[in-house]
C-alpha cells in the first residue's frame, strides 16, 4: 500500500462558523464550513481512476487540522450482486450492474486510534466520522463553490420527532440468568477457534412501494440510501469479525408483493414467508431486510425474529426509513440484525463504556455505534449453541481490475491475508504492511488453521449434527473446513422410522412434537382420511385458490394430524395451519409415508429409491 508522507498541511480556506442551515440531514443549528483538500497518493503520470482505492483529505474541525484516511470498502458488494425492479406491467427485471468502481469508503482520522469513518465520496464527502470520542457528520453544501462542505455534531441536528423510537421486539428468546460472561463459558479450544473465525453475511435489502413514492420513483436515490446504510452496517459489525456483503436489492416499483401494513408483527410475518417462498428461489442469500417508509404503529421503527440466522423464513427483519440521517437507519438495521444473531435488548446492567448501545430497546437521540458486553456474550453463546452454517460461507470476491486495498480486513485478489492497518493488526500470521503471510506460516484463520499452520489431514472441523449428517475433516491443504455435507437422501435413520433428507431425519412423530409438544404423537390413519376430501385446509396440493385432494396412497403427505396419547374410544384429530404461510402444518418433504416410501415435492408418497 502506498504511503504518503505529509511534509506540510496546507488548508485551502479557513472554516466558516455558521449558526443555522437546512441540509440533507435536516435543520442544523451549529456547523462549520470546510473545504476538504485531497492529498493524492498516486504517482505522477499514473492514470486517475474515478474512485481511488485509498484517499486522504485535509480539513479543520473546531479550528484544528485533521487528516481523514479513506479506504474503499471493496467487500461491500458480492460478485453476483443484482438489482431487481418491476415494470409498469408487472414484469420482473433483474440486472447485474458493475459495482467494482463504487464510491463507498471506511476510514479513520490520523493520530486518533479510536476513530472510525463511513463516507460516501460519490458527490463530495457525505457520511460521518468519530473524532476524539465524538460523532461528526459531513456533507456537501449546495453552493456555487462545489468544494464547500458542512461539518457538524449530531447533537446539533434538530430532531424531526421528539417521540421515542423503539424496536418492536418485546421478549427474549433465551433465558440465561444471569448472563454468562465470555470468560465464564469454559470454551474448548475448538469453540474458541470457531468464535475467532471470520463470519460472512450475504444480505438482500428490499425497498417497498412506499419507499418508491417517498423518493418520487427515483431508484438512484433509493440505491444511494441503501448503499450508505449497508456501508455503515458493515463497519459496525467489524467488532464481531463479521463482514456484511450486499448481494442484492429489490425495489417494489410497481406495487408491494406483500401487504405492508403499519402493524409491524404482521408485516414481518408476511415478509418472512415471502422471502422463504419467493426470494430464496431466485437469489441466494443469508439474511433479508425490508426497508419501508410506512409509519409503524406506536414508537416501533423495526422488528426482527430472534436467534434465527440462516433460517429460510426467520432470518429476516423489517426497518422503517425513519430518519433523514443514514447513520440512524443503519443503526436500526444493525439492531434488528443483532436480534437474528442472538442478541436481546440491553438491560440496565449492560455496558458500552458510557456510550449509547446498539441493542438498547429505545433508539437514542445520539447514534449508537457500539455493542454492549451483554450483546457480545449473548451473540457468542448463540453462535456456540447453534452454529448457524450459512455465515461460514465466504461470498465470491469480485475479480477487480484495480489493485486490492491492503488493510480493509477483506482478503481480495492477490492478497493472502488482511488483518487491517499495521497499527491495528493483532494477527501474528499476517504481515499487515503487505497482506502476505509471514515466512513459515500457512494460514491466517479458519477452522482448519491453528497457530498459523494447516491442521493435519483428518482433524475433525465440523461434528455431525445427526445420524443423517457427516462430520467434516480438514484436508491438511487448506485453512477452510470442507463444505458441509450429509448422508445420501433416502438412507434409513432412527431405527428405520425415517429416511435421511438433506441432513435430517424427518418423522411424523417429531413434527407433532414440534407443533404441539412432547405429549403428542402422530394420529391414526382415520384422521389422515380427511386429506382425501380436498376441502378447507385438508388437501395435498394447492395452486393459487384451487386445492387438490390427496390420492389414497398420498394422504400422509398432506395435512399433518396428531393426537394426545390414548384417548379411549374417541379420537381427537389435531392439525394446525396458517393463513399467511400455507405450508405450515403440512407434512415435511422427505418424511416417511410408508415402508420404503417418502413424501416428495409434489406431496406424493413415492418409492424412496426414485424420490431423489
UniProtKB/Swiss-Prot annotation:
Record keywords: Calcium, Cell adhesion impairing toxin, Disulfide bond, Glycoprotein, Hemostasis impairing toxin, Hydrolase, Metal-binding, Metalloprotease, Protease, Secreted, Signal, Toxin, Zinc, Zymogen
Pfam families the UniProt entry points to: ADAM_CR (PF08516), Disintegrin (PF00200), Pep_M12B_propep (PF01562), Reprolysin (PF01421)
Residue stretches spanning the membrane: none
Protein residues bound to Zn(2+): 335, 339, 345
GO CC aspect terms: extracellular region; plasma membrane
Keyword Signal: yes
Keyword set includes Transferase: no
Prodomain positions: 21-189
Enzyme active site: 336
Role description: Snake venom metalloproteinase that impairs hemostasis in the envenomed animal.
Name listed for the protein in its UniProt record: Zinc metalloproteinase-disintegrin-like 8
